[in-house]
Amino acid sequence: MDRSGSSDFAGAAATTGRSNPAPWSDDKESPNNEDDSNEDDGDHTTPAKVTDPLAPKLANNERILVVSVTERTRETWGQKAEFLLAVIGFAVDLGNVWRFPYICYQNGGGAFLVPYCLFLIFGGLPLFYMELALGQFHRCGCLSIWKRICPALKGVGYAICLIDIYMGMYYNTIIGWAVYYLFASFTSKLPWTSCDNPWNTENCMQVTSENFTELATSPAKEFFERKVLESYKGNGLDFMGPVKPTLALCVFGVFVLVYFSLWKGVRSAGKVVWVTALAPYVVLIILLVRGVSLPGADEGIKYYLTPEWHKLKNSKVWIDAASQIFFSLGPGFGTLLALSSYNKFNNNCYRDALITSSINCLTSFLAGFVIFSVLGYMAYVQKTSIDKVGLEGPGLVFIVYPEAIATMSGSVFWSIIFFLMLITLGLDSTFGGLEAMITALCDEYPRVIGRRRELFVLLLLAFIFLCALPTMTYGGVVLVNFLNVYGPGLAILFVVFVEAAGVFWFYGVDRFSSDVEQMLGSKPGLFWRICWTYISPVFLLTIFIFSIMGYKEMLGEEYYYPDWSYQVGWAVTCSSVLCIPMYIIYKFFFASKGGCRQRLQESFQPEDNCGSVVPGQQGTSV
C-alpha cells in the first residue's frame, strides 16, 4: 500500500534545523512503520510549491533528508468514524452511569446543569481540544511529545504512564465484577431475587416486603457482598485474604479481550470500537424505554430534574461540577494524545472536540433518565422516598439496579443487556488508558518496543494483571476504592495542571495557535486563547486544591481506613507526581551542557531537531 510508488525511497526533502524537521531525526525509527493506504498525503516525490505554508524552505548548506517510505508513514485510523468512536468510548465510561446522575440530584437537580455547562465551556472543553490538537500535530505519545514542547517536563509523560498502570490495576477488576454478573444472569431465575441461597443470612429480606427495615439486607446486596466479592471473609486492608479464583478468572478474561483489541494498534482497536462504543447507546435507549414505562418512573425523573436553585450558593456544588467535567472528559491521561496522533495531519480536530465532548455530556444526561426512572420505580415498589433508594458509585449499578431488574418481567433479558452495557463501557475506557501508555513507550523506544508491539502489550498486560491480583481478594473491594482515590484521583489533577502550564506558558499559546493554524488553516479565536492562558490552569488548580482538602470524603464512609493506609496512599500519589520534579532535575543537571542559562534554554525550550510533523517531511538524516 505504498502511496508514493514502488521505490524503496520516496524521494528527498531538505530542511533546516528549525523548519519542520524529522520527528525521528535522532535516528529513532517510526514506531508504526507499516504503510497505510488510508492516509492520503499525496505524492512526495515532487517538491512542494514554495507558496505552500507547510513546504520545507530551501536554503544554502542545508542537510538533506532521505525520506524512506517505511519511516515516513505513521499508521492512521481506517476511518474517521473509528477515531470518533474511540474517543467517545474512552470519555463515556462507568462514571457517566453511576456518578453523574447521583451528583446531579444531590447538587440541585436541574440547577446543577448550570455550573456543569459553564465548566464544560470554560474548563473541560479547552483542555480536551488542546490534547486532540497536540497529539494530531506532533503525532506521538505523551513521552516523545515533550522534546517538542518543553523537554524538562517529560516527567509528565512518565507520571501519566504510572497513573495508567494504577488505573489498570483496579478498573479492570470492576469490569470483572460485571462479567461475573453477566454469567450469573444466564439462568432461569436471577440468583439475587430470593433469600434462599447458601450465601444469604438471616437478615436477608425482600425489598418489597412490608417488614423490610434498615437492619434488613436485600438479596441483591447480599449477592454482591457475599457471593461476588465474599468480602465477609476478609477484613479490609488489614486482612485481605486469598485471591478469589472465580473473580480472578473473570478479570483474566477481561485482560484477554483487551489484549486482542490492542495488540495490532489502531488497526485492531478501530474495529473493536464499532461494537464497544455503539452497543452502550443501543442498550441505554432500550433501558430508557423500559424504565419510563414503569410505575413511579415519572416521580424519579421529576426528582432528577427539579431544580433547587438555592443550592448554587454552596461552593461544593461548583467543585463537584468541575470535578465531574474533568474526570468525565478525561484530559491528562494521555489517551486523547495517543488516539489523535493516528489522525491525518489536516483532520479537523476542533470539530472533533466539539462533537465528542458534547456527546459525552449528553450521554451523562441520558444515563440520568435511565437510572432515575428505575429509582422512581423502586421507590414506588418499596413505598419509600427516592433518596432512601439511591446509592452512589458501584452500589448503584451492582445492587440497586439489579434489585430493580429482579422485579421486572423478563428480568433475565434485562440483566444480560444491562451488564453487557457495563462491560462495553468499561472496556472502551480501559482500551484508551492502556493505549496511551503503549503508544507513548512505542514512540519513545521504537527499536526495543515499537518493533515488538505484540510481545510488549502481552508482557505489559501480564504485569498489570499480576499487580491487580490483590484487588481480586476477599478484601479487594476496599483496595479498588483506595486505588481509585490515590492512584489517578489526586495525582492526575496536578499532572494535567503542569501539562497545561508547559503547553500554554512555556511552549506558548501563540506558538500552539500557529500549530493549529498549520493543521486547520486558521488560528484559534480569542476565546480559546484566553481560556488556555488563564481560565483552564485556574480551573485545574482549584479542583486540585479542593480535592486535597476533601480526600477523606472521596474515600467514602462505609469503611474505616487504618491510619497507616493514608501514608501508603500518599506514597502512591507521590510516586507519580514526583516523576515531574525528578525529571526536571535530571534534565537540568545531567542531560544538559553549558552554563546555567544554556541549561535552562535546553531544558525549557523545544529541541532544535524537533518540530512539527508535517506529512512528507519525516525522515532519517544522512
From Swiss-Prot:
Single GO MF descriptor: monoamine transmembrane transporter activity
Amino acids binding Na(+) 1: G89, V92, L425, D428, S429
Extracellular topological segments: 176-244
Glycosylation sites: N211
Subcellular location: Cell membrane
Keyword Transmembrane helix on entry: yes
Membrane topology: Multi-pass membrane protein
UniProt-annotated binding residues for Na(+) 2: A91, N96, S328, N360
GO cellular component, one term: plasma membrane
Protein name (Swiss-Prot/TrEMBL): Sodium-dependent serotonin transporter
Natural source organism: Drosophila melanogaster (Fruit fly)
